[in-house]
Amino acid sequence: AMSPEDVRRHMEKAGIYLFTSDRQEGWGAVLNEAMNSGCAVVAGDAAGATPFLVQDGANGSVYHSGDVQELYEKVRRLLDDPSTQRAFGSAAYRTITGLWNAETAAERFLQLSQALLDGRDATKLFADGPCSPASLLREDWYRK
């Protein structure tokens, strides 16, 4: 097994991370790790974290899980266009460090807990990011 430091080092060298998990993955914290390492991610739409972390064409690419041709096209685009690869990697890093970080999660958890203890409606506290409402997603949430 690799140490967390070794994993991080490999991700930072990789440039691109393929997140091909399906609905059995749950959240898939490795996506957070890859984005925090500055990888341009290509993520399947069926994994739990994808709709919350990856904005297709802005901070990564999303493909329909199981569509190998679409996965190939998204990866090929990043390989053929290093500037887009770098831009996605930088935007992914900013997504994690700017919003989906431990400090924000801890602060929001405390605010959420206090709201619940006070009997207030906590569903409107945060529009996105940690502790925001996560409604059920339809299987076809991602459209090309």
Residue ranges and their predicted role:
Residues 70, 77, 84-98, 105-111, ...:
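A short, well-ordered alpha-helix in the C-terminal region of glycosyltransferases
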Residues 98, 103-144:
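C-terminal amphipathic helix plus adjacent low-complexity
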Residues 40-44:
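Short hydrophobic beta-strand element within catalytic cores of glycosyltransferases
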Residues 56-57, 61-68, 77-82:
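Conserved acidic donor-binding segment of nucleotide-sugar-dependent glycosyltransferases
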Residues 8, 31-36, 50-52, 58:
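Short alpha-helical segment that forms part of, or immediately flanks, the ligand-binding pocket
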Residues 12-26, 39:
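Acidic donor-binding loop of glycosyltransferase active sites
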Residues 1-11, 22, 66:
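Conserved active-site histidine-acidic residue motif and adjacent donor-binding/catalytic loop
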Residues 5-8, 26, 47-53, 69:
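Short glycine/proline-enriched, acidic/aromatic patches that form the donor-sugar handling elements
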